[in-house]
Amino acid sequence: MREYKLVVLGSRGVGKSALTVQFVQGIFVEKYDPTIEDSYREQVEVDAQQCMLEILDTAGTEQFTAMRDLYMKNGQGFALVYSITAQSTFNDLQDLREQILRVKDTDDVPMILVGNKCDLEDERVVGKEQGQNLARQWNNCAFLESSAKSKINVNEIFYDLVRQINRKTPVPGKARKKSSCQLL
């Protein structure tokens, strides 16, 4: 079974843990409890393939920056999450993306831009078009709006990253047995 290392990044309070826990455990975490770093393993089926996802739920961008390079180096796919209710969380993502590309030393990194808390439409300050435009600027990066509370597009975030990783590095075919031939 193929393993995937996915990293959830964004400012504090955008709902990174809520999205991850909703995906892995199917529950919504109401209480805000700042994360230092949590790791989850979840077996899922994506496009008829069994996959083991290792999901790293990270601290807000302002904290524990020393650890960030390490999980950017080891991660294969990245969910960059902002809250549609806080413009600053959207603005923070540009630097985060640039850091990922610098650490990975490539522009071709499986990534999805996620506008979270779309159930709070009355409190929206970041328009959907802003997210779509930023995703376009980022080499047509995938983009979704989600809500951990209302279970909107939660699974799709992680499944999309798996599909991007599969497109970038297809599963190798079954290795052929090496045979040897001896002439006498």
UniProtKB/Swiss-Prot annotation:
The enzyme's E.C. designation: 3.6.5.2
Function according to Swiss-Prot or TrEMBL: Probable GTP-binding protein with intrinsic GTPase activity.
Gene: RAP1BL
Single GO biological process annotation from the record: cellular response to cAMP
Family classification: Belongs to the small GTPase superfamily. Ras family.
Molecular-function annotations in GO: GDP binding; GTP binding; GTPase activity
Matches recorded under PROSITE patterns: RAS
Name of the protein in its database record: Ras-related protein Rap-1b-like protein
Motif (Effector region): 32-40
One of the Pfam families matching this protein, by short name: Ras
Keyword GTP-binding applies: yes
Broad class of where this protein is predominantly found: membrane
InterPro entries noted in UniProt: P-loop_NTPase (IPR027417), Rap1 (IPR038851), Small_GTP-bd (IPR005225), Small_GTPase (IPR001806), Small_GTPase_Ras-type (IPR020849)
Database matches in SUPFAM superfamilies: P-loop containing nucleoside triphosphate hydrolases (SSF52540)
First-tier enzyme category under EC: hydrolase
Keyword Lipoprotein listed: yes
Binding-site residues, GTP: 10-18, 57-61, 116-119, 147-149
Keywords (A to Z) from UniProt: ADP-ribosylation, Cell membrane, Cytoplasm, GTP-binding, Hydrolase, Lipoprotein, Membrane, Nucleotide-binding, Prenylation
